[in-house]
Amino acid sequence: MRYLITGTAGFIGFHLAKRLLDDGHFVVGFDGMTPYYDVKLKEKRTAILARSNGFKAVTGMLEDKAALDHAAELAEPDVIVHLAAQAGVRYSLENPRSYVDSNLVGSFNVLELARSIQPKHLLLASTSSVYGANEKIPFAESDKADEQMTIYAATKKSMELMAHSYAHLFHIPTTVFRFFTVYGPWGRPDMALFKFVEAIKHDRPIEIYGEGKMSRDFTYIDDLVEGIVKLIGVIPSEENRVVSDTISDTLSKNAPFRIVNIGGGQPVGLMAFVETIEAMLGKRAIRHMLPMQPGDVHNTYAVPDLLVALTGFKPQIEVDAGVRRFVEWYQENY
């Protein structure tokens, strides 16, 4: 098949594009190569993808509709996967406008593109952050998600709502997946695992927020990609509605639209995560304990039942194994 993927120079987009290329598909990657973190890392990812004859890279910002249209002309996509976004909860406190530009205006342009070319399936990346102040644990897709705690989460929730309206109005089969703390090789330098490994290696203190009492449903990148690949083949329709007394399918009654969590449902305490990193590095961290930061939540915890019902797949790579793979990659590259 032919794919247009936004964000292929980013962490998740790179891994998804590589998987699809390895499977023999044609991929056009669209990325703004923004300097939110080291552009050299993005260039290295793109160079790896460019080794495949089935990959074409287009550089452009999501806000630039003409550039996005050009990428679509090259791709002639059967499937669009929209992964590009301004990410990072804490950075959204410093530079909220970039989140509106990328996550709202950019996503609107992707939706307009889908309206124009009518792909077989449109898939969009959202986040567990949309659950916000929801106190019900674990998080199921049908749970209340109306009190976002950051502009990042608010823009992602807004994208979900816009996507539903486009699916309804223009009959675009659409799946939104909510990610849960993705980690692994080639990850972003601003994420906890990368920051902790780098700090411990160089004898710098690590900053542990919430006094270490938080937990996260860490999802290894290969598991996430497997979940996405399987969902690509599950085009939302009444034919695959999940009918169950225990699973609430989010398939809309008014549109070919569905929201699916991609998370393992096995949250890990932050201190246990730190101890795992220490064990892999053979070195104890210098710990700087800090209070909860604005926008943070105490826990994330996915209910993966809908993903399992639709695809037969559940994230399965344990944190110990995932951290080991990241540390091995880091030591080889840094």
Curated annotation (Swiss-Prot):
Q: Which cofactor does it need?
A: NAD(+)
Q: Which Gene3D superfamilies match?
A: NAD(P)-binding Rossmann-like Domain
* Protein residues bound to NAD(+): 10-12, 156
Tell me the GO molecular function terms. UDP-glucuronate 4-epimerase activity
Q: Which CDD domains match?
A: UDP_GE_SDE_e (cd05253)
Which reaction is catalysed here?
UDP-alpha-D-glucuronate = UDP-alpha-D-galacturonate
Q: List its EC numbers.
A: 5.1.3.6
Keyword field: Isomerase, NAD
Catalytic residues?
A: 152 (proton acceptor)
Please name the InterPro entries in this protein's record: Epimerase_deHydtase, NAD(P)-bd_dom_sf
Task: Identify which top EC class this enzyme belongs to.
Answer: isomerase
User: Which family, according to UniProt?
Assistant: Belongs to the NAD(P)-dependent epimerase/dehydratase family.
The protein's job, in short, is:
Catalyzes the interconversion of UDP-D-glucuronic acid (UDP-GlcA) and UDP-D-galacturonic acid (UDP-GalA).
Q: What is this protein called?
A: UDP-glucuronate 4-epimerase
What is the source species? Rhizobium rhizogenes (strain K84 / ATCC BAA-868) (Agrobacterium radiobacter)
- Which gene name does the record give? lpsL
